[in-house]
Regions:
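Structural beta-alpha unit
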Residues: 1-19, 91-122, 141
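Small/aliphatic-rich secondary-structure junction motif
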Residues: 15-68, 72, 97, 146
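Structural motif
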Residues: 27-31, 125-129, 156
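Short helix-loop-beta junction
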Residues: 47-48, 85-95
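A short acidic, glycine-rich active-site loop
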Residues: 71-80
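Glycine-rich, Arg-bearing micro-motifs that act as flexible, cationic patches
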Residues: 124-145
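Short, flexible loop segments at boundaries between secondary-structure elements
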Residues: 144-156
Length: 156
């Protein structure tokens, strides 16, 4: 092998098109959001230059047919916190929206939201004290196993 071939750097592949940027989803199940999760979600959205969706999933009762027909917008305290998160994200320079959905199975419905909205990162952010340590781990594991995107936090 000649020195001319050995000293030449290999040609680096060049991407023809940019990678698609997909939004960040901050999720809670009708429980106040964790402060660290809020900061992480806003930071991830700013760093990637993508939209932040602040999502509240409400569980509908299935035992009573009349109750299942009633949709609600969630706990008013949590709704106020969602407005504050959206305001914080916009003040920091990120685009932000609220998303509320009702389902008898909110975790299963989440996978449809992730697919339909083409979410790139789910930040699972309910307050762990209110939500419960074991339930948090179980739901995080299920979301991580079935979601078509990245899921944060990495550890429960």
């Amino acid at each position: 092998m000649t020195s001319a071939v050995r000293d030449r750097a290999p040609a680096a592949p060049v991407a023809d098109e940019r990678t698609e940027r997909r939004p960040v989803l901050l999720l809670s199940f009708d429980i106040l959001f964790d402060e660290q999760a809020i900061d992480d979600a806003i930071g991830f959205a700013l760093e990637a230059g993508v939209e932040l969706l602040v999502c509240l999933a409400n569980t509908l009762p299935t035992a009573n047919a009349n109750a299942a027909a009633r949709r609600h917008m969630g706990n008013p305290v949590v709704r106020e916190q969602m407005l504050e998160i959206v305001r914080l994200a916009r003040d920091a320079g990120a685009e932000a929206q609220q998303l509320v959905y009702n389902s008898p199975r909110p975790i299963s419905a989440l996978f449809g939201v992730v697919r339909d909205r083409r979410i790139g990162l789910v930040v699972f952010g309910p307050n762990r004290r209110s939500y419960g340590r074991l339930r948090f781990r179980w739901h995080l594991r299920r979301i991580r196993r079935n979601a078509d995107c990245l899921v944060w936090p990495l550890e429960a």
